[in-house]
Amino acid sequence: MEKALVLRFLAGVYYIKDLETQIILEAKKRGKLKTPDIKTTQKENSSASDFIIKVGDIVFYELSCDTYLIQSILPRKNELKRPNVANIDQVLLVFSLVKPNFQFLLLDKFLLILEQQKLDVVLVFSKIDLLEPENLTTMQQQLSYYQKFQPFYYINSKQKIGIDALKHIFANQITVLAGQTGVGKSTLLKALIPDAKLKTQEISESLGRGKHTTKNAQLYEFNGGFIVDTPGFSKLDLTTFCPRTLKNFYPDFVEHVCDCFFGESCLHLQEEKCGVKKSLENGKILPSRYQNYVSFYEEIKNQLKY
């Protein structure tokens, strides 16, 4: 059997790239898929026969009766359920500064979920041309707080401003483009790979948000690596979090825990002598960052009541 990387799934056909010959083939899944040591994100009652092959999977395949059949999947180092992508090296998290308007709440929620998944994040802020210079400067000052945790880029995809500075991060990596619908992920991908077959749409004036332009996850080769364009994220679920351990997914909080009177058991809420709250008062923690933490804590706590 030969080994290949899954690039795309469309209408029952898997597009795979042979890792030795580099040839792209059309393949189908065998009736009963072999999935040794695969940790699935599907429901517990899922079986090998209905196991979902994800974009990014490394698979074994063979030719049978003039049809290439995927026989088995190699163990994944990580995976996402929505979108269905496996073996991710990093996430390129794209936010627009306007249209749709930027929200610190949404940024913090994305970072929280990706931190739980133990995925490296690169932050990209698009549509810088649509802000007045003074407003852009103000936004950059506020966003600079996040630079101590993630690589950081400002871009204008349509005019290709900042695109060249971004290219090196894709080398030898499988990179997932993530972000709210309409922030310019497909436009960014088109700026990086002009011949990629993509459709971009204008923002809905009535809703102030984007329409879906990507329906299925797909791997595109670029600069020695692969970029995964995914459907827009319309729902960010916090149901996998526990209120008491939420704080552990805030690296900027963790570095101040040593100053908490209650140490690692401190929730950074009502406790006295809290190192995180002291750092907040001293301007070392962004106020919106802490406020969003409290909001997420209450949201998760309320979910447990039902």
Curated annotation (Swiss-Prot):
Cysteines paired by S-S bonds: none
A single BP term in Gene Ontology: ribosomal small subunit biogenesis
Binding site for GTP: 126-129, 179-187
Requisite cofactors: Zn(2+)
Annotated positions binding Zn(2+): 260, 266, 268, 274
GO cellular component: a single term: cytoplasm
Compartments where located: Cytoplasm
Domain CP-type G: 77-236
Keywords recorded for this protein, A-Z: Cytoplasm, GTP-binding, Hydrolase, Metal-binding, Nucleotide-binding, Ribosome biogenesis, RNA-binding, rRNA-binding, Zinc
EC number(s) from the headed UniProt entry: 3.6.1.-
GO molecular function: GTP binding; GTPase activity; metal ion binding; rRNA binding
Cofactor note: Binds 1 zinc ion per subunit.
Functional description taken from the UniProt entry: One of several proteins that assist in the late maturation steps of the functional core of the 30S ribosomal subunit. Helps release RbfA from mature subunits. May play a role in the assembly of ribosomal proteins into the subunit. Circularly permuted GTPase that catalyzes slow GTP hydrolysis, GTPase activity is stimulated by the 30S ribosomal subunit.
Quaternary structure, from the entry: Monomer. Associates with 30S ribosomal subunit, binds 16S rRNA.
Membership in a protein family: Belongs to the TRAFAC class YlqF/YawG GTPase family. RsgA subfamily.
Designated name of the protein: Small ribosomal subunit biogenesis GTPase RsgA
